[in-house]
């Protein structure tokens, strides 16, 4: 493996950024901690730019703005593996996510190496090297980081940099275009935020609520999100989903009644109980109630519509020479049915359409989907 440099000064970072602007592509990864916070804590940034591999230490108080500006440069191409949570970190610190990204997990899937291939499996396939994963659960905020932690972090971009051109060469021009489009789609999705007033539409057990309870649930979801962000604690630390559902259905009116709610912590009642009760009152006072929601799989016509969409997915996968799961998962099919049958028109103007309606999927499937929904319901 290449020798690596741990960057702990602004001068070192500026010098690296200048070098990185003149290479064909960067291999990028991040290490972070998110066990007890809403916002992830960035612990390390690993980058390989040609023959230079650096570990950027954000914990020591570096000015990272030159690096973020580097990543925003449309002439800088970025290679990343399974970048989902990395994109959230970048959005949090940069205010945006770079769009010129090639995700090697997506590339490997389109090259026929299986869906959701992990980094260790990717390295094993291309180099026959076993990557040490013993540090995957380490605390990246602690200092100093041990040599084995630094070696582990460096390996995440060392091999990725060399694998990228080999993987890219396996893809036809059409598949390369699809990989780039899918990478861009995944980046865009991580940057989206559902407006608070529509969060209840995507709450798994919302169908158990009547219309009045849905109005309360709508307010409760906004309360929980606001509390989590302001206190920088995970959503589940404020209130778990089953607790929100119980609150919405029982609609407690007093602090004493809050104490009878399953798993609602005394800390939440003490410091946020008044705001919680206010949210419930606001939901109860709503004059325009949400439409009743049914469990999707129980709705009339669900099964034939699901199967008809699945047939189109299978046909498209065969046409493209990829696995059906790369076109759409069961959840993505359900997202389309949910969108058509349960998302109000008013909400659709505020929300991004399901995956099957956008990008390369939409170009191939949208006409077929429209025909299915006109025919089967």
Task: Name each model-derived stretch.
Residues 1-26, 30:
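N-terminal accessory regions of nucleic-acid-interacting proteins
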Residues 4-6, 46, 51-66, 70-161, ...:
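Active-site-proximal helix-loop-helix substrate-binding element of RNase H-like nuclease domains
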Residues 27, 36, 43-47:
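Non-catalytic, usually N-terminal nucleic-acid engagement modules in DNA/RNA processing proteins
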Residues 31-33, 263-264:
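Short beta-turn/strand-loop junction motif enriched in small, turn-promoting residues
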Residues 37-41, 55-58:
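Short, glycine/acidic-enriched capping/hinge loops at junctions between secondary-structure elements
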Residues 39-40, 90-92, 165:
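Short amphipathic alpha-helical segments
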Residues 147, 167-377:
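Accessory DNA-binding and partner-docking regions appended to nucleic-acid-acting proteins
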């Amino acid at each position: 493996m290449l020798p690596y440099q741990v960057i702990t000064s602004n001068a070192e970072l500026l010098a690296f950024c200048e070098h990185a602007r003149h290479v064909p592509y960067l291999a990028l990864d991040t290490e972070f901690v998110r066990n007890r916070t809403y916002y992830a804590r960035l612990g390390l940034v690993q980058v390989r730019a040609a023959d230079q591999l650096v570990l950027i230490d954000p914990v020591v108080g570096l000015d990272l703005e030159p690096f973020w500006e580097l990543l925003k440069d449309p002439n800088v191409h970025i290679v990343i593996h399974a970048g989902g949570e990395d994109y959230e970190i970048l959005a949090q610190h940069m205010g945006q996510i770079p769009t010129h990204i090639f995700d090697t997990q997506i590339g490997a899937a389109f090259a026929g190496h299986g869906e959701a291939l992990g980094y260790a499996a990717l390295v094993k396939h291309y180099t026959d090297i076993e990557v040490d994963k013993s540090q995957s659960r380490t605390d990246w905020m602690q200092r100093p980081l041990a040599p084995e932690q630094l070696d582990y972090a460096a390996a995440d971009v060392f091999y990725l940099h060399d694998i990228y051109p080999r993987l890219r060469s396996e893809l036809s021009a059409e598949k390369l275009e699809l990989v780039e489009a899918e990478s861009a789609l995944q980046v865009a999705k991580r940057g989206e935020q559902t407006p608070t007033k529509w969060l209840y539409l995507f709450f798994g057990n919302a169908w158990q609520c009547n219309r009045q309870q849905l109005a309360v649930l709508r307010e409760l979801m906004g309360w929980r999100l606001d509390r989590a962000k302001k206190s920088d604690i995970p959503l589940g630390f404020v209130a778990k989903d089953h607790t929100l559902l119980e609150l919405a259905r029982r609609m407690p009116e007093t602090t004493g009644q809050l104490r009878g709610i399953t798993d609602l912590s005394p800390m939440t009642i003490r410091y946020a109980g008044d705001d919680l009760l206010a949210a419930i009152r606001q939901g109860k006072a709503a004059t325009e109630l949400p439409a009743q929601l049914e469990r999707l799989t129980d709705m009339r016509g669900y099964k034939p519509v699901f199967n008809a969409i699945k047939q189109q997915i299978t046909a498209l996968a065969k046409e493209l020479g990829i696995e059906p799961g790369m076109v759409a998962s069961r959840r993505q099919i359900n997202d389309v049915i949910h969108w058509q049958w349960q998302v109000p028109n008013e909400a659709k103007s505020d929300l991004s359409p399901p995956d099957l309606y956008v990008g390369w999927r939409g170009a191939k499937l949208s006409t077929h989907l429209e025909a299915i929904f006109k025919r089967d319901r």
